């Protein structure tokens, strides 16, 4: 979680977007249920977004339309294939340290990813030149969830669950890759430089204003 919090913040600080309002949200108390005033289950994100909307002179209808047009990256690490316990991993959804950002999917909807949001995120990764891996739990192994779905109870929007591969999650020997840290900063910067918009065909696409500005100059 700290790795994703750090890289997300770095991308947020590096990003520049004059077409959208960039938001970086970092929640506390996930491991004890997220029910605190600073947790993902609180109204904190909803309240902040509503205040921004009000400060811009917008009404409630504008707020709900803005949410529907928004896009969230729910960033929380993923389980890499462990060399001592390879059988714990689904053989068709293996992720490895230092081989790129992970997109997480779950048939039981424990992650926010869907076909549309995954496609949008893959496009952002391609623009950033960052490799992508795909993770899903073994169907007979119970896995956890992330803050994305918890936050969705307050602010419904398009979202994809991503993270970085690591070993020994939640232990005192958590291990992750340094290259993945740089990969995540790159893709986060590209995300915060992009404007996610809906086309006339009701498809979502990411328009990179960094690339547009470079083309214009």
Language model segments and positions:
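Acidic/histidine-rich catalytic neighborhood of metal-dependent amide-processing enzymes
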Residues: 6-96, 196-199
